[in-house]
Amino acid sequence: STSNRYDDTAMWKLPTTASYQPMNAVLALEAMKRLVKEPTASWRKILETTSWKGRMEEALPGIVLDGAHNMPAVRALAKSIRMQEKFRSPDGKLIVLFSAVKEKDYHEMIRFVCREIPADLIVVTKIPDERGVNPGELQKDFAQWTDSRVVVKDTVKEACSYVTACKREQDQVYCFGSLYLVGEMETLLREAARC
């Protein structure tokens, strides 16, 4: 969670590790102050219990879903991951699960990810939509920019099964690149948690 001082009144807590959410919360509070004309302190409890689906959302312990699907969002995600790195176990691995749609600049996203996110393992897959990039193409792009192992899984379900099977307690998985991927993963992980 993130703590920050706001409005010279108190410490505000957000239940997120996303580096970009404190600014989003401040913007929301300022809007509410002007639109609703209520003191910001009344919103404190609400913020402390707010969750943002698909935004640095820990869907299961050590498995984070983030809707980063363009360069600004991937940059913000990378910043959040780097901030969390100091808390990861020394023998823990960082696993990336990635997919993208054809009309996004996924080549640039992949170059950036390889340069800025210290992944030990990268799993690529295809979203269940004709706009999804072939995972073999994603693998080739990643292979140009990293020495980390890149594993191809043909479906999101196979990718989900793979990362949950190989993830150890001390490992951290970040799933991003497509909102479709995050939505599919959320459904699959919710079903897995019920079993």
Write out the residue ranges for each language-model feature.
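C-terminal alpha-helix
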Residues: 34-35, 162, 166, 188-192
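C-terminal helical cap/extension that packs against the catalytic core
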Residues: 1-3, 22, 64, 110-172
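Nucleotide phosphate-binding/pyrophosphate-handling subdomain across enzymes
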Residues: 8-121
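Short helix-terminating capping/connector loops at secondary-structure junctions
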Residues: 88-92, 168-170, 174
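Glycine/aspartate-rich loop-and-adjacent alpha/beta segment that forms the canonical ThDP
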Residues: 178-195
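Glycine-rich beta-strand-to-loop/alpha-helix junction loops that act as flexible
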Residues: 98-101, 126-127, 176-179
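Short amphipathic alpha-helical segments
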Residues: 76-78, 90, 109-111, 135-137, ...
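Alpha-helix capping/helix-boundary segments
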Residues: 27, 158, 180-181
